[in-house]
Structure formats: structure tokens, C-alpha cells
């Protein structure tokens, strides 16, 4: 794997090529079987690993590839990228195609693959033998994934490449141990600060806010009648008793406070990035605590901004057409 040619149409940035060559050097010169790439979100991890797969395939190192991610949407997106950039590669998404096991590049969630290696066919044995794959790619590699799905990594006898956007200094020490690396020293790293400096990514800006309940907790006697009712519904126990106040640390259970949501939405609609010469809010993602919280935010948005019909939508694993909704949101021509 010395002096390999990297397809610059797939991965043309200097750090992408450097990452590919670092993995090749690790596998070939250093005889390692595990590699960890730490690359900032938006820097092209998937493109990098696609170009790497092309290099390893052309050099005769790999034929069958397994790409694992923890969510269906990530599996779908990765498969789509492989198809677009390596159109001659036969691929399958096990989450959608349950009977196409002959493809050279298999995409799957961890749970689906666990089911596959636990399944035995009557005539031909297991769906995938332990030596079926020549390379396993683990998206968002971290200790919790490895611990939860250890059987996958123990079962397949193949080199392992981990991808993560977590800054290298924040990655759990045990994750480095999994990839047999020195703590804080990935196979290759390209982080946000460098990407911003290079002009490939834009740094984030934060808007600091002070919300009474979140910062200082809740005192029942200071609430409005409407919020008192919600407080009672939320915190009253089976004996009809409830605390006089709730500290800010306990408020994760009461993020559904309508007043808090209204204030957060007001801050967003006032200070959020605008389009159409500042006349309307641009595309925005609001991360909720859970599905119920997301539904509450959606409900409050509908009340407060009833003139913006169709502006807000809850997208999570309960939505049957979640991927289509994500695709539409990602389309710059659609709002």
C-alpha cells in the first residue's frame, strides 16, 4: 500500500488524502488491523472512507466490505454516497433488502447485523461466515457501541476502521484501547478548529440566554394558574403531594413548560439566521429531549406562529417516511 493513488474526484482535499494514506500505512507498514479516523462533522468522513475503499479494492486488499451505523438514516445516507461515487460497486442495505447477501458492500445497522450473525440458514449455514468481510467500517465509533455490539466485532475476522467526529481529546480512553491506539492519538485526526482555519467549515456562534425556570428552578407559588396546573400534573405523587419547588437540576422532567418553549422559540425567531432579505427564518433544527418534548414544541409553535403553516415538523424514528423528510429538508431548493 505504498505510493497509493487516491481518486481526487472522490476525496480531493489534502487531509482526506492524508487520512487515507495514514490508514494504508497503519495496515501495511505497521501491520495493524484497526484504525480510527477523527474528522470534524462536515469535513467528508464518508467521502474519505469511500476513496479508501477504492484504494484497498484496487490494491487487492478488500473485496467484501461491511459498513455499520447505529441509525437507519445514517445507513441510507452512507449507501447513497457509495452508490453515487462508486457506481460499479454492488451494494445492499440490509435494513431494506433482506435477501441480497451477495453484494460486495453491505450496509447495516448494528442491531440488524446482530440478527444476521445469529441467524442460521438450513442449507448453507450462517448468512455471513466470520471471514466473509475483508473490511468492517464502524460509523461513530465509541466505547458504548463496542460494548453493546461486541459480538459483531468478535465474530468477524477483518480489519476494522472506526469513524468519529468527537474531538480526539474528548474520546473515551477505552475507545482508543479498542482500536489498540495510544490515548489521544488516533490514526489520523482533522478537527473543527483546523477545518475552520482552512476555510472548509464555518465556526459556530452561540447565543447566550437566561431562562428563569432553567436557570433558577421552579417555585409553585410564583407560577401562573396554567403553569400551576401543569406543575401539579407533572410532580404530584400518588398521595396527592408535591414539592413546593423544583431545583434547576431536576428540570429535565419539566422541559414541557409552555412558557419556556415560547421564550426559546421567540429567541430563535428573533435571532435565528434569516433568508429572503431577512423576512423569514432559515432552515433550523431544534433538538428535543425526546418524542413527547418534540411534539410539545411543535404544538406550541403552531399556536404561536399559526400563520406559518407547514413550517415545523417532528422528524424522528416514529415517522415512517423520516428519510424522505430529511431528504426534503436537505434540499436547498425546498423550504
Question: Over which residues does each language-model region extend?
Answer:
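Conserved helicase motor "Helicase C" RecA-like lobe of SF1/SF2 P-loop NTPases
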Residues: 290-314
